[in-house]
A protein has these predicted regions:
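Acidic, low-complexity proline/glycine/alanine-rich linker and hinge segments
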Residues: 1-23, 59-69, 95
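A beta-hairpin/wing motif
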Residues: 24-40, 57, 76-95
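Residue-level marker of intrinsically disordered, low-complexity segments enriched
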Residues: 6-10, 29, 33, 46
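A short, well-structured alpha-helical segment
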Residues: 26, 37, 41-74
């Protein structure tokens, strides 16, 4: 039985749709970089890409990223911090 495992997402929050984008029917996405902690939480989210820019998708994605939960990376039975993890949040209108 292996004592090693890689990080796996166990909870992905739904970001709040930016109000201005929602009322104008705008769709988009944002990519956030996070550090996964030894306990599977995340810290230090940074928006690295937003499309289209200026509609609030990046800000909403950063807020949602703080609620991401992972099973942490484990090496020799010990949780490891994992930097530079990218997560893409998509914003799509209900059809």
């Amino acid at each position: 039985f292996s004592r090693d495992s890689d990080y796996i997402p166990v909870y992905i929050p739904q970001p709040q749709y930016p109000r201005r984008a929602q009322t104008r029917g705008k769709e988009g996405y944002a990519v956030v970089e996070v550090i996964i902690t030894t306990t599977g939480g995340v810290r230090d989210p940074v928006m690295v890409e937003e499309f289209p820019e200026g509609w609030g998708f990046g800000r909403a994605a950063v807020k949602a990223a703080l609620k991401l939960k992972y099973n942490p990376r484990v090496v020799d039975g010990v949780g490891q911090e994992v930097p530079n993890v990218l997560y893409k949040f998509s914003f799509q209108m209900e059809k």
